[in-house]
Amino acid sequence: LTAVLKADAYGXGIGL
């Protein structure tokens, strides 16, 4: 995963 996806996962709760 990219840092952007990780940040989105932590921030939005997607869990990617």
UniProtKB/Swiss-Prot annotation:
UniProt name for this protein: Broad specificity amino acid racemase
UniProt entry tagged with the keyword Protein biosynthesis: no
E.C. designation(s): 5.1.1.-
Entry similarity comment: Belongs to the alanine racemase family.
Cofactors that this protein relies on: pyridoxal 5'-phosphate
Residues where N6-(pyridoxal phosphate)lysine is found: K6
MF terms in GO: isomerase activity
Active site: K6
Presence of keyword Isomerase: yes
Domain of life: Bacteria
Keywords, in A-Z order: Isomerase, Pyridoxal phosphate
